[in-house]
Structure formats: structure tokens, C-alpha cells
Amino acid sequence: MSETAKKVIVGMSGGVDSSVSAWLLQQQGYQVEGLFMKNWEEDDGEEYCTAAADLADAQAVCDKLGIELHTVNFAAEYWDNVFELFLAEYKAGRTPNPDILCNKEIKFKAFLEFAAEDLGADYIATGHYVRRADVDGKSRLLRGLDSNKDQSYFLYTLSHEQIAQSLFPVGELEKPQVRKIAEDLGLVTAKKKDSTGICFIGERKFREFLGRYLPAQPGKIITVDGDEIGEHQGLMYHTLGQRKGLGIGGTKEGTEEPWYVVDKDVENNILVVAQGHEHPRLMSVGLIAQQLHWVDREPFTGTMRCTVKTRYRQTDIPCTVKALDDDRIKVIFDEPVAAVTPGQSAVFYNGEVCLGGGIIEQRLPLPV
């Protein structure tokens, strides 16, 4: 580290990963400060609202490490740039991924700008399980060392410029190591469970929460053969490949296998189901993606061989990618894939390197 230590602002969520990130950066000689972002205005007293507890934990960690904790409210930015689009996608019958949008608009845009302009930061840091590597003057996004926790899928919209201004200390570690460091340091977050639920909104009852903002429109549930076997409470509550929560568990036909959502007919408000998690109607040979983001920001032309994930924690799928125009690509899988879901993201890899990705516009069904 140079004589004048570089200043890093760590996004402190009140969790173990950001806590340990701050300590690791201190050990590396950086001048470290924390920032707690409030991105949702609580409108109830439900137990799912944990912002106050998270702030208290973040403050306790910063006090223990001897660093300053700043706070900022990005609720307006979150509503305008993340939540409204999230609702619009659900209304259109698609299944969006708010965490990806939140990283794009809040953590690596609003936070990055605030840290640089208002707090004089040289870098920001987060507790994401990813790594960066600088190659040929550009910063690359790499998978986290812990393949169980790798979060590169959620960060594919970042540009090489944003990655160059970001540090990911826990990306070089495995989760048990991170927890052990926190325990050894006596941090209050050491045994805190990992957060789940919608980015920044927390662990609310999703159906109830969504119902506040979008009116439910009940409709028919039909089989692939056209038989009506039930009623859904709203297409927005269902996604392709879903098994639980359909309310038709006792309905037996044919194979007696469980029912899965295989299609959503938005125009007619109909949910289509079939039996078996590998039913041909659930399988796709490829997809069309749009709203492309390539980490190196170079336009993609021609074709390439790589691997793709169509959802988080999925095993990499070998595929061929072909450019259709500036902002659309066609992806053909080597083998058919189940539950490819419009609105979700397709993220591409070359080995450890995350190349970028796009939003799934449509799936290319298996010919039957």
C-alpha cells in the first residue's frame, strides 16, 4: 500500500460477509469506512422488517473494528429504478430477478457515485462472493472461489469500469472461513444467517407482499391436454417449473407424478400444468435474450461457444451463442434444459470468467 492509504467504503449490510470484508481490507492496509444503505421505507411493523436490527449490527461491527459508519437513504432510487420495473415485469407475466437490477442500479451505481463524490472513496467494497482480475488494462469479473456461494450471476451487468472501482475481499475465501474469521474476531454477525428474500425488502411473505401492489386476477389451471383442473389466484404468483403452491396436489392423472407449471397464457390468464419435472413441454432447446450487458462493453457479433446459466445455482450448460442484432442473441443448448423462464437472466461464462448476459425474452421449446 502507498504512503497515503487508499480509501475504501464498504457496503455494510449487517451481515457476516460485509463485516469480514471490512476487516480483511483493514489488514491489507486500506483506510476503511462503512456505509449502511436504507433502500426501502417500511410501511408496517412486521417482523420481516429487519432494517433497524441490521443497522445496529453494522454499527456494532464498525465500533469493534474502529471504523466510521455512514448511512444513506436510497429508497427513492430503489423505488424508481428497481421496484417499479419489478412490478411491471410481474404484471406482464414474466419472472424478474430484482437482485440483479438492485446491483445494477443501487449497489454499483447509486452507492458507487455517493462513495466517490460524497465520501471521497477510491474504491467501494461489498461482501459478494466474486473475484476480479485485471487483464490487458480491463477488469474482469470472475466466479467466487467458493462455488457454492459464487454470486457472479447477480453481477453480470457490471462494466469493467465499475469492477475496476470495486473490491470483493471474501471472493477469495470459502464461506466457512469467513464465519470462522468473524467468530475469532468476536463479531456480532458471526452466526447471523444469510439473508434471503427480495433484495433489500427482506423476508416477507411474498404472495401477500406482491398482492399489495398488484391486484390478483384468478383464472383457470388447465393441463397440457386442455382439461381444467383448478383455479390460480394470479399468474404473477407462479413461475415455470414451479411445483409447490398450485393447490392441485390431490389431482391425479396418468403418471400420478407431481404437477409442474409449464406455461403461462397471459392473454387469457391461464396457467398450464403437466406432470413430471422433465415433461417435454417444460424443456427448451434454447432461448432468445435481449437487454444485453457484456462486462468488457465490446459489442458481440458472430457466434461463440461458452457456457450459460439460466438461473442461479444452476450447473453450467454448454451452448452456442449467435448475435441476432445489437441487442439480441440466440442461444442453443447442447442438451435440452428445463424451466427456462422469460424475465430471468441468461449469464455467460468462459471458464472462471463471467462474460455478461441478458434478459430471457423467450424460450425455444423442445419440438413435440
Swiss-Prot record:
Q: Does the keyword Magnesium apply?
A: no
Cite the residue spans of the region called Interaction with tRNA: 149-151, 311-312
Which superkingdom heads the taxonomic lineage of this protein's source?
Bacteria
Q: Which Gene Ontology biological process is one annotated for this entry? A: tRNA wobble position uridine thiolation
Give the EC class as a word. transferase
- Gene Ontology CC annotations of this record: cytoplasm
**Quick check: keyword tRNA processing in the entry?**
yes
For this UniProt record, the keywords arranged alphabetically read as follows: ATP-binding, Cytoplasm, Disulfide bond, Nucleotide-binding, RNA-binding, Transferase, tRNA processing, tRNA-binding
Instruction: Show the catalytic activity.
Output: S-sulfanyl-L-cysteinyl-[protein] + uridine(34) in tRNA + AH2 + ATP = 2-thiouridine(34) in tRNA + L-cysteinyl-[protein] + A + AMP + diphosphate + H(+)
Q: What is its EC number?
A: 2.8.1.13
Instruction: Identify the SUPFAM superfamilies for this entry.
Output: Adenine nucleotide alpha hydrolases-like (SSF52402)
- Catalytic center residues: 102 (nucleophile), 199 (cysteine persulfide intermediate)
Record-linked InterPro entries: MnmA-like (IPR004506), MnmA-like_C (IPR046885), MnmA-like_central (IPR046884), MnmA-like_central_sf (IPR023382), Rossmann-like_a/b/a_fold (IPR014729)
Compartment(s): Cytoplasm
Point out the annotated site residues (description: Interaction with tRNA): 128, 344
Q: Where does ATP bind?
A: 11-18, 37, 127
* An example molecular function term from Gene Ontology annotations: tRNA-uridine 2-sulfurtransferase activity
**Disulfide-bonded cysteines:** 102-199
- Quaternary state and interactors: Interacts with TusE.
Q: What does this protein do?
A: Catalyzes the 2-thiolation of uridine at the wobble position (U34) of tRNA(Lys), tRNA(Glu) and tRNA(Gln), leading to the formation of s(2)U34, the first step of tRNA-mnm(5)s(2)U34 synthesis. Sulfur is provided by IscS, via a sulfur-relay system. Binds ATP and its substrate tRNAs.
- Name of this protein: tRNA-specific 2-thiouridylase MnmA
Organism of origin is Shigella flexneri
The gene is: mnmA
